[in-house]
Amino acid sequence: MYCRRSHLKKPSMSHRTHDYWIAHQGTPLHGVLSIPGDKSISHRAVMFAALADGTSRIDGFLEAEDTCSTAEILARLGVRIETPLSTQRIVHGVGVDGLQASHIPLDCGNAGTGMRLLAGLLVAQPFDSVLVGDASLSKRPMRRVTDPLSQMGARIDTSDDGTPPLRIYGGQLLHGIDFISPVASAQIKSAVLLAGLYARNETVVREPHPTRDYTERMLTAFGVDIDVSTGCARLRGGQRLCATDITIPADFSSAAFYLVAASVIPGSDITLRAVGLNPRRIGLLTVLRLMGANIVESNRHEQGGEPVVDLRVRYAPLQGTRVPEDLVADMIDEFPALFVAAAAAEGQTVVSGAAELRVKESDRLAAMVTGLRVLGVQVDETADGATIHGGPIGHGTINSHGDHRIAMAFSIAGQLSVSTVRIEDVANVATSFPDYETLARSAGFGLEVYCDPA
């Protein structure tokens, strides 16, 4: 049964798993495409605006399930948020000390970013809170966040295996720490910095590799004095946030699927407008260029404190490459798309140092390796990466494991298939890219959406 889903409605988990796509060869991609707003920035913008003194306007807000979950949680905590347009939020901030207790668990849905950042915020409040998530989020590791928060004096419980739900006990006095993060994670860094706003003395976060600095840039935009150097951020507690207006650029991770698709579908020529090019986010762009992609930047400017460009992408034959390990953290969300580019390239592409892929919304490493093998692509899997041997892409049925990025990646593979690719469990695409199917088809994708009532 063909269906058209509304991204504004959250179907029950028992029903979501029956949504599937049939992807097949379409036409060369053409057009000027507007990608939805950045998910990471949208989470932070609505959260920091809620903590600010005064009213903030957010334009370009991503109207997707993950970001709406965060906004709904803030509303439950007493923040008034207006929605004049689907991509706009007017947030009436309550100040750093104005949040109110919720008497029911706070549902983050599939939003790992939302849960981890909210944990950093809620450990500093005078009331107890419980953060829960969907089946996928409930399997993701949280001790990497709860451990440093506990070092600051927070009381926070997880399940026995370190996964959600998170039970947070309010009324704790936090103190700043000098935290050396064992992994490069902007979410860990952001959670600790948020708690640091409420802590005595100074909070320092040091990373093994610099990660995306959305939190640091946005705290600065909201008037917080934060010192940033390579791989290190520090701030003093007790600061207040001042309301400001934010314009959010297009999400690079969402644009990534079109960067890859236009690069591998012969005859394609598209332009992606106003894409955020945070320096710690664009590893995929570097790797695609190493592979021979034809991607040209224009109209560079700043938007919401972030560098923004238009990207023109034209088809070019790709060659396999070795992905530099120092780029892995800068493209951790883009690896599913890269794996498809590698499958379409001539020669071998080698990925290493990417063990973090195993603890995303799914084990993305295993999911991509298994899926590509189903389509006849030779892939050698390792503990922290894979070697992908480029070649023809066949047909088959792919289990996306409810992971939005796995589903979208294999929709690209379907454009190169000798037949069709069926991609199952795709409803969670709405968590990051509402109306992905509509935009993809308008650009030239062969992509049909079905609901299996069984």
From Swiss-Prot:
The active site is at residue 333. It is found in: Cytoplasm. One of its GO terms (cellular component) is cytoplasm. Monomer. 3-phosphoshikimate binds at residues 39-40, 44, 185, 187, 333, 360. Belongs to the EPSP synthase family. SUPFAM superfamilies: EPT/RTPC-like. It comes from Xylella fastidiosa (strain 9a5c). Its EC number is 2.5.1.19. GO terms for biological process: amino acid biosynthetic process; aromatic amino acid family biosynthetic process; chorismate biosynthetic process. Pfam families: EPSP_synthase (PF00275). It catalyses: 3-phosphoshikimate + phosphoenolpyruvate = 5-O-(1-carboxyvinyl)-3-phosphoshikimate + phosphate. Pathway: Metabolic intermediate biosynthesis; chorismate biosynthesis; chorismate from D-erythrose 4-phosphate and phosphoenolpyruvate: step 6/7. This is 3-phosphoshikimate 1-carboxyvinyltransferase. Phosphoenolpyruvate binds at residues 39, 112, 140, 187, 364, 405. CDD domains: EPSP_synthase. It comes from the Bacteria.
